[in-house]
């Protein structure tokens, strides 16, 4: 009898990747392994789906280490401080992403958890595509295989992320750079989309109304 796998969190954004309509509305995270010579690194990144920015990254040298996931999530929480709109954080069902310690960090925030279905990496196409060519550019253009220490590796990563966010044209956002695309949004230079209007009667997705109601209840208690 086949085993039924119960997903810890529902996939809130399945098939709606192209309808994300503002910065920080959906953030995705994943871990990828980078190996060369005798070095082994696990690189965990957090991306903004709308702007394509790399919001934060952390590295571990031990297989299965969890600090880089936690540190990245704390970076995201700090980045979102002061905002009053919910943010969906979408990941796969990796053990750290599913852990109590990880998800306890967001219990008092407006971050809503979403997960790919078990065994369905295509539920997170943003990360699946980004990880591949980011690793390719790190080796081809930034020569990370020449780094002889973790410090040199992190310096190369830092330089790459700066290049990626500030200088690298991105096809998905009209060959703009991620940081400039975000700035243009807040200047009102980008057309606003009605994310859910054509798909359901209520133009505001359920997870947004629920989190806003929660935020309102918390303010009333104060």
Give residue ranges: language-model regions.
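RNase H-like two-metal-ion nuclease catalytic core shared by retroviral integrases
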Residues: 4, 91-93, 99-100, 113-137, ...
């Amino acid at each position: 009898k086949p085993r039924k796998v119960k997903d810890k969190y529902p996939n809130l954004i399945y098939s709606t990747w192209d309808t994300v309509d503002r910065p920080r509305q959906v953030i995705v995270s994943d871990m990828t392994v980078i190996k060369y010579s005798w070095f082994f690194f696990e690189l965990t990144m957090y991306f903004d789906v709308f702007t394509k920015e790399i919001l934060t990254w952390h590295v571990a040298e031990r297989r299965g280490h969890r600090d880089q996931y936690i540190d990245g999530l704390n970076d995201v929480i700090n980045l979102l401080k002061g905002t009053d709109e919910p943010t969906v954080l979408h990941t796969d069902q990796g053990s750290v992403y599913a852990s109590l310690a990880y998800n306890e960090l967001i219990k008092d925030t407006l971050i809503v958890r979403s997960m790919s279905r078990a065994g369905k990496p295509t539920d997170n196409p943003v990360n699946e595509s980004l990880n591949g060519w980011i690793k390719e550019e790190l080796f081809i253009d930034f020569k990370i295989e020449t780094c002889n220490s973790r410090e040199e590796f992190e310096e190369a990563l830092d330089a790459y992320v700066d290049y990626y966010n500030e200088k690298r044209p991105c096809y998905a956002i009209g060959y703009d750079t991620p940081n400039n695309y975000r700035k243009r949004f807040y200047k009102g230079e980008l057309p606003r989309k009605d994310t859910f209007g054509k798909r359901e009667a209520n133009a505001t997705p359920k997870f947004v109304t629920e989190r806003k109601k929660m935020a309102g209840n918390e303010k009333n208690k104060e």
